[in-house]
Amino acid sequence: AGDPQGLEETTQYAPWPMSAPWLLNQLYDHYLYITDEEYKNRILPMFESCLAFYKDFLVEYNGKLVTCPSISPENKFKDAGTSACITYMPSMDRELLYEFFANCRELGLETPEIEQVEPASDGRIPEYAEEFGETEVEHRHVSHLYCIYPARIPASNELNLAAEKSLLKRGFGGTGWSLGWKVCLWARLKNGENAYRLIKQQLTYISPSSKFHKGGGSYPNLFDAHPPFQIDGNFGVCAGIAEMLKNEALPKEWSGSIKGIKLHGGKEISYSFKNGKRI
């Protein structure tokens, strides 16, 4: 994200060097659904080029490879009492590369070694390589929880517990697209009640005349309320509902059935449920 030449936007969100592995992780995830060798051969050159870039971009610091400079998108931290955003190896960078390199290895490529993120001293998943102070505890972004969702590599129980603490600390507010992310995260953590709470919040009626709305909600046509509107909120909540159904993270209020939800490896699931329980 961002254009280093003539960059006029804030470093709080513009100079992020990690879009490529995220996009390629999505391509590999698609491959795992269809397992088509022709498709795999089509995407392999992109993985080779991206891998070559990060082999060159990573630098050694304290005996470990890190990204630098980088940011945790749109967030800031406190360092010696000063608000800052540029740093090295934010957790999202680490988590993206951890998965990207794993995908590369499955494609037969040799990669550097990157360790998975670990819980901080407060039991949460840290947002940065160092435990900086927070400038906005309930920030709308949850970038540092990529290792939980949408990452395909299952997180450890320790990381899942740390993610729960992180989400509770961030709260249940945010823009519509932020609520979408949180629905997906709670669904991956198999907490259907918290996911459903956010879905209902996202479906709260918002007047079309609203100029700006930070708490989610939907216009009468069900567009995500974030003027003019942001489709991220709509797609994010839909993805979260699919994740809830896949993981049987069902709130007590739900009864119904699903048919043909796709899984990796060409598999699919169908089942009925009543009062939040599979039957």
Role assignments for model-derived ranges:
Residues 39-49, 64-70, 197-201, 249-256:
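Beta-strand segments within the central parallel beta-sheet cores of soluble alpha/beta enzyme folds
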Residues 82-86, 251-279:
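Surface beta-strand/loop "capping" patches
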Residues 25-27, 34, 69-71, 152, ...:
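Active-site proximal loops enriched in glycine and acidic residues that flank catalytic Cys/His/Asp
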Residues 73-89, 217-230, 256:
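Short beta-alpha connecting loops at secondary-structure transitions
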Residues 19, 51, 63, 90, ...:
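Structural beta-strand/beta-sheet cores of well-ordered domains, especially the beta-sheet scaffolds
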Residues 1-41, 45, 91-247:
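Active-site core of glycosidic bond-cleaving carbohydrate-active enzymes
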